[in-house]
Amino acid sequence: MSRYRGPRLKKIRRLGALPGLTRKTPKSGSNPKKKFHSGKKEQYRIRLQEKQKLRFHYGLTERQLLRYVYIAGKAKRSTGQVLLQLLEMRLDNILFRLGMASTIPGARQLVNHRHILVNGRIVNIPSFRCKPRDIITTKDNQRSKGLVQNSIASSDPGKLPKHLTIDTLEYKGLVNKILDRKWVGLKINELLVVEY
């Protein structure tokens, strides 16, 4: 299955808030299908919704998510927490969390178009796994800085997680350490994703 490029608000109405997918929010009471979904939710449906939340928030394909679950399963720690750490340490997600891009798809585009440097080298792979003490900057040209400047100006500095720091004047971000579970930007039960 390829990456989702369809209407984003439909997914948000179905799955709940996905800040990485879009900044838009649906109008209240605008879902006519909601009244028909009453009663008990099946366990399979709950697990599937949690998995879909993870996929759409981080912009993953089914195969990528399975690969991350496989890698997390080999770790000695909790599989769910390792899975979230792997996803949160992706370059596209770190750009989004730093405020250098308004959404994760926007961050993917910045990386694919070679506007981003990691430790002084151009990286054009959005799934690049960042490590502690990595320095993320933009290219020195005006166009790259302009793209990031608009996003930084509109982002909220209070939402910056503890494992990241940003210098807004130099358009530079720093990964301090590996993420703790409480700073994940998505409300999700990762154990249900692993069970699925």
UniProtKB/Swiss-Prot annotation:
GO terms for biological process: ribosomal small subunit biogenesis; translation. Signal peptide: none annotated. Residues 1-14 have a biased composition (Basic residues). It is found in: Plastid, Chloroplast. Residues 89-169 form the S4 RNA-binding domain. InterPro entries: Ribosomal_uS4, Ribosomal_uS4_bac-type, Ribosomal_uS4_CS, Ribosomal_uS4_N, S4_RNA-bd, S4_RNA-bd_sf. One of its GO terms (molecular function) is rRNA binding. It holds the Pfam family S4. One of its GO terms (cellular component) is chloroplast. Residues 1-43 are annotated as: Disordered. Keywords: Chloroplast, Plastid, Ribonucleoprotein, Ribosomal protein, RNA-binding, rRNA-binding. One of the primary rRNA binding proteins, it binds directly to 16S rRNA where it nucleates assembly of the body of the 30S subunit. With S5 and S12 plays an important role in translational accuracy. HAMAP family: Ribosomal_uS4_B. Belongs to the universal ribosomal protein uS4 family. NCBIfam families: PRK05327.1 (NF003717), rpsD_bact (TIGR01017). Part of the 30S ribosomal subunit. Contacts protein S5. The interaction surface between S4 and S5 is involved in control of translational fidelity. This is Small ribosomal subunit protein uS4c. It comes from Melica uniflora.
